[in-house]
């Protein structure tokens, strides 16, 4: 990709991110689960937007997981356990401007399969 294409790709993601963020908000009972994916790793955190604090997080890099669908499913299972320990059974899924496809979708499906209502 050349520089112009990368700029356009990032600009489109930023526009999607603002559009999504304007419609989502999390609180203590139903936090916002925000995801970030780099080229190599996957991260997620549960955020209480009222207190502006992170309730819990998971770091795929520290756990040795890569940015693949199989690893995203494993991370989803582990993150669902962390959310249940914190007493959370419902959440709002913030895909952070990423398309709901591949790793982002696999993580969300794994959360749903493990009892977290999104």
From Swiss-Prot:
- Key word Lyase present: no
Native organism is Helicobacter pylori (strain Shi470)
Q: Which GO terms describe its molecular function?
A: 5S rRNA binding; structural constituent of ribosome
Q: What is this protein for, i.e. what is its function?
A: This is one of the proteins that bind and probably mediate the attachment of the 5S RNA into the large ribosomal subunit, where it forms part of the central protuberance.
Q: What is this protein called?
A: Large ribosomal subunit protein uL18
Family, according to the entry, reads as follows: Belongs to the universal ribosomal protein uL18 family.
Q: Which InterPro entries match?
A: Ribosomal_uL18_bac-type, Ribosomal_uL18_bac/euk
Entry keywords, A to Z: Ribonucleoprotein, Ribosomal protein, RNA-binding, rRNA-binding
Short name of one Pfam family: Ribosomal_L18p
Gene name for this UniProt entry: rplR
